[in-house]
A protein has these predicted regions:
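Loop/turn elements at helix/coil->beta-strand transitions in domains of secreted/extracellular proteins
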Residues: 89-92, 176-182, 209-216, 241-244
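N-terminal module-boundary/linker segments of secreted carbohydrate-active enzymes
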Residues: 51-102
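Ser/Thr-rich, Proline-interspersed low-complexity disordered segments
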Residues: 9-12, 16-67, 71
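Bacterial N-terminal signal peptides that target proteins for export
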Residues: 1-7
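Active-site-proximal beta-strand/loop segments in catalytic clefts of secreted hydrolases
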Residues: 96-99, 183-188, 218-222, 247-252
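Conserved SGNH/GDSL esterase-like catalytic core that processes O-acyl groups on lipids
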Residues: 83-196
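Catalytic His-Asp segment of secreted/periplasmic serine-dependent ester chemistry enzymes
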Residues: 222-308
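Active-site segments of SGNH/GDSL-like serine hydrolases
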Residues: 182, 188-189, 202-234
Length: 308
């Protein structure tokens, strides 16, 4: 039985961004290391704290029509208010994710005024200024090779910065003390159903809520599983917990090749241009839209949370 448990856990933790081809336009070298077979600590159990009453479920493919930029609900305001009582920093947000998050392409440029141009989206500058420092921060809850289970597993945490038995998301929340977490986990375990993805994602969401951190949950741009089941699960979770959903998938659909690289043509890696939103040619690529809509989602949530 013990050998079987070790084998199953090892399989669950192996898959993340390695499901895509190893060629990548990203400047960083993605990790090729995998969890040791000796990993025995399971992902943390779902919090025993009460959670919001489930909302009505979405209809088939209804998630595809949900807006790209979310609106803030009373539930999100309640989470934020609890976080303020706990001492969460209103000017900090954290990134939670895998290799598509752990890259210099994602949000980092907004901490460098020469690296982006807002154009018609100049109203977003207030949000860039408000969260200065969080855009380029290397979160302890993002890393190449992470998936929904790894985020919850102490053995995947940075041993130099995290405490013993502390998982990556708990470590990040302790060290950065955010009031908001943008959660974008693109990949699932190999050949496992979306229900398994949802089981772990719910633990991440419930832990964030318990800690007074407002989760912004993102759909993914790809459909590697073939039936959009993971995005459907992500949207269902957002509706269930009444939390903000950033529908990245919808933003990418009008773009050439749905915003994915035509050179790699793997349906996973986004096409790249720099974040100058006033240059029409740049806005034909996926990465500027990922960064723009992430910033728009953050801006909408910030403004909504601050409304009295």
């Amino acid at each position: 039985m013990k050998v079987r448990q070790l084998f199953l856990l090892s399989i669950m933790l192996l898959a993340a961004c390695t499901t895509a081809p190893t060629a990548t336009p990203q400047p960083e070298t993605e990790s090729t290391s995998t969890p040791e077979a000796t990993e025995t600590e399971a992902a943390i159990a779902a919090t025993e704290e009460s959670v919001p009453t489930p909302r009505p479920t979405l209809g088939p493919d209804e998630w595809m029509t949900l807006p790209v930029v979310p609106e803030v609900t009373d539930t999100a305001r309640e989470i934020y208010a609890r976080g303020q009582e706990l001492g969460r920093d209103p000017k900090h947000f954290s990134k939670v994710g895998d290799c598509q998050t752990n890259t210099g392409f994602y949000l980092v440029d907004f901490d460098n005024e020469d690296a982006y141009g807002l154009g018609e989206y100049a109203y977003l500058q207030d949000t860039i200024d408000y969260y200065e420092g969080s855009f380029s921060r290397t979160s302890l809850a993002m890393r190449d090779g992470y998936n929904v289970a790894a985020i919850l597993t102490p053995l995947r945490a940075d041993p130099k910065q995290c405490e013993k038995n502390e998982n990556p998301i708990a470590c990040e929340f302790r060290l950065h003390n955010p009031s908001i977490a943008i959660i974008s986990l693109e990949t699932n375990f190999s050949d496992r159903p979306a229900d398994d993805y949802g089981k772990y994602m719910r633990q991440i969401i419930e832990y964030s809520i318990e800690q007074g951190v407002v989760p912004i949950l993102a759909t993914k741009g790809d459909n590697l599983e073939g039936d959009h089941s993971i995005n459907a699960e992500i949207a269902e979770i957002a509706v269930e917990y009444d939390i903000p959903l950033w529908n990245l998938w919808a933003a990418l659909q009008p773009l050439p090749n749905q915003g994915h690289s035509t050179e790699l043509n793997d349906g996973f890696h986004l096409s790249f241009s720099r974040n100058f939103f006033d240059k029409p040619k740049n806005m034909l690529s996926g990465w500027p839209w990922r960064n723009l809509t992430a910033l728009q989602a953050l801006d909408s949530v910030r403004r909504g949370l601050q409304e009295q």
